[in-house]
């Protein structure tokens, strides 16, 4: 698959149900790792791993390229807070970028930020990535990821 691509996304918080989070990563060899931890109603952590075809990896790269996220900077984005944090790390070609911000509830939060254009790019990219991962996990394991 080539070692020029890696993606990791994390969103989570620590609250009355402990450390609840969603995390996934795509490794250069095509391995998709997925973890979803919720202690709500004594749920257990869901961990799944699968290998995806190189065409999926190419589509992932296309989604990232089309989003133009590599042109963004998180300096003016809301910092992580008690509501939670999001992290996105991407290695694509010679570029290595990493973003950290608070959880985003809706586009209202995006529009009220100091960098609505940049945060909007992040927001929609994350929505696309989560949709893709949930579909892959759901289809591969026949489970509901949430």
UniProtKB/Swiss-Prot annotation:
Induction: In macrophages, strongly induced by bacterial lipopolysaccharide (LPS). Levels reach a maximum 6 hours after exposure to LPS and are lower, but still much increased after 12 and 24 hours.
Positions of disulphide bridges: none
Gene Ontology CC: one annotated term: cytosol
Tissues of expression: Ubiquitous. Detected in brain, heart, liver, lung, spleen and testis.
UniProt keyword terms in alphabetical order: mRNA processing, mRNA splicing, mRNA transport, Nucleus, RNA-binding, Spliceosome, Transport
Subcellular compartments: Nucleus
An example molecular function term from Gene Ontology annotations: RNA binding
Domain of life according to the entry: Eukaryota
Gene Ontology biological-process entries: mRNA export from nucleus; mRNA splicing, via spliceosome; regulation of mRNA processing; regulation of nuclear-transcribed mRNA catabolic process, nonsense-mediated decay
Transport among keywords: yes
Main localization of the protein described in the UniProt heading: nucleus
Family recorded in the similarity comment: Belongs to the mago nashi family.
Subunit structure of this chain's protein: Component of the pre-catalytic, catalytic and post-catalytic spliceosome complexes. Heterodimer with RBM8A. Core component of the mRNA splicing-dependent exon junction complex (EJC); the core complex contains CASC3, EIF4A3, MAGOH or MAGOHB, and RBM8A.
Cited PANTHER family: MAGO HOMOLOG, EXON JUNCTION COMPLEX SUBUNIT-RELATED, PROTEIN MAGO NASHI HOMOLOG
Function as written in the Swiss-Prot or TrEMBL entry: Required for pre-mRNA splicing as component of the spliceosome. Plays a redundant role with MAGOH in the exon junction complex and in the nonsense-mediated decay (NMD) pathway.
Name recorded for this polypeptide: Protein mago nashi homolog 2
The organism of origin for this protein: Mus musculus
